[in-house]
Structures are given as structure tokens and as C-alpha cells.
Amino acid sequence: MVSLLCCGPKLAACGIVISVWGVIMLILLGVFFNVHSAVLIEDVPFTEEDIFEDPNPPAKMYRLYEQVSYNCFIAAAIYIVLGGFSFCQVRLNKRKEYMVR
């Protein structure tokens, strides 16, 4: 039978901790980008054409903020999947401890 166990107990626990931290951080960043926080303007990928040549510059900037917000939420979802994988590895390691060799 093929074993799905590919991580040790310490690596799996570390993966859970990093995933929880990543999900919390990315959800907060996504919320802050969604409310168009002025502090995060440096992280919005805009060019001078977006500001000076656009007849309605705030609308373009708001779309860019929302795009970065969606990217943060997608990355948080990926971290949730990786956290679930790490949790499964922890469970498999626990089950391996109880098996008789």
C-alpha cells in the first residue's frame, strides 16, 4: 500500500503554524486593500499613465486596489489548502505512531 506520508511531524506542525499566520496576514491585507487604505499605495501596481492620462484616475486606482485585494484572498485560499495538507500529515504521523511494526 502506498503511504501518503511525506512530511515528518515537526515539518507538518511548522506548515500548520505558517499557514495559519499566512491566512491571517493575507486576509487582513485583502481587507485593507479592499477599503483602499492610503498606507498601501506603494504596493499598488500603477504607472504614470494610470494617473495622468486617465480622465477618471480614482476609478482606475480603485480597480487596481481591488485587484490586489482579490490576489490576497486567492493567496489566503492557497494557504488554507496547504494548511489542510499539513494537518493531514500531522494526522498520518499520529496514526503511524500507533501502528505495530
Swiss-Prot record:
A GO MF annotation of the entry reads:
RNA endonuclease activity
Print the keywords alphabetically: Endonuclease, Hydrolase, Membrane, Nuclease, Transmembrane, Transmembrane helix
Record's GO cellular component terms: membrane
Q: Report how it sits in the membrane.
A: Multi-pass membrane protein
EC number(s): the record gives: 3.1.-.-
**What stretches pass through the bilayer?**
13-33, 68-88
Uppermost EC category: hydrolase
- The source's superkingdom equals Eukaryota
Chain segments annotated as coiled-coil in the UniProt record: none
Q: Where in the cell is it found?
A: Membrane
Fetch the Pfam families from UniProt.
V-ATPase_su_f
- Similarity comment: family membership: Belongs to the RNase K family.
Record's function text: Endoribonuclease which preferentially cleaves ApU and ApG phosphodiester bonds.
Quote the protein name from its UniProt record. Ribonuclease kappa-A
Q: What is the lineage of its organism?
A: Eukaryota, Metazoa, Chordata, Craniata, Vertebrata
